[in-house]
Amino acid sequence: EKFVMISTDKAVNPTNVMGCSKRIAEIYVQSLARKLSLENKNKKYTSFITTRFGNVLGSNGSVIPRFRKQITDGGPVTVTHPEIIRYFMTIPEACKLVLEAGGMGSGGEIYIFDMGEPVKILDLAKRMIKLSGRTEVKIEFTGLRHGEKLYEELLNVKEQTEMTYHDKIMIANVRQYDYETVKEMITELVNTTQSYDSMKIVGLMKELVPEFISKNSLFEELDHKNEKQEDHKSCGELLDHPSELKRDASSLN
């Protein structure tokens, strides 16, 4: 049997809770797959595979149906930022590639898909207005939402890819995690959700996914605290190694 988890490009260097939750799911699924492969070398077991891609055209909550409704209602068509871009796939493309990745995966892989060139959302809005024939409809910029990026990434800067036999499917080489450690941290996170303390919950998420840096959000203060702790730690390390402190000071002369 195979289990295919659907992830998103928002899991890469996440800037909001949704993207981070997807990255946590990736980490859990991949660490579980690794554990099962080590424990069941000569037995059958469920293979856990992850697929990571961008926006699916026409799916529930996607930008196309929203723009279509706004145009039908006479506008305005709302775009968050004039420079925002996104990767898109059609529903048939997404289904086909997910099934293909599920078929080729043996367990633990994170598959990413070649989605071509990203699309500027403003250009998409203009084209839809033009095709509708309702050129009087205006476009309104509403500003980036909490945790929203101008562009999404399919890979972290530390990640690399391996090619597969399919020219549109690649494997992301990501950091490996110990399953028991991940399980312990996720259990703590789940238990903490019962407190409804959003700062504490997001703080634990940031421990699991250190590259989760909040953007346009009240959770940014957690990142500032982490930066101060890192600075304090670095200072302490230098005091523990005075020769390094002396060397750094001499380099300034």
Indicate where each model-derived feature is located:
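Conserved Rossmann-fold NAD(P)-dependent oxidoreductase catalytic core, especially the SDR/UDP-sugar
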Residues: 1-26, 31, 37
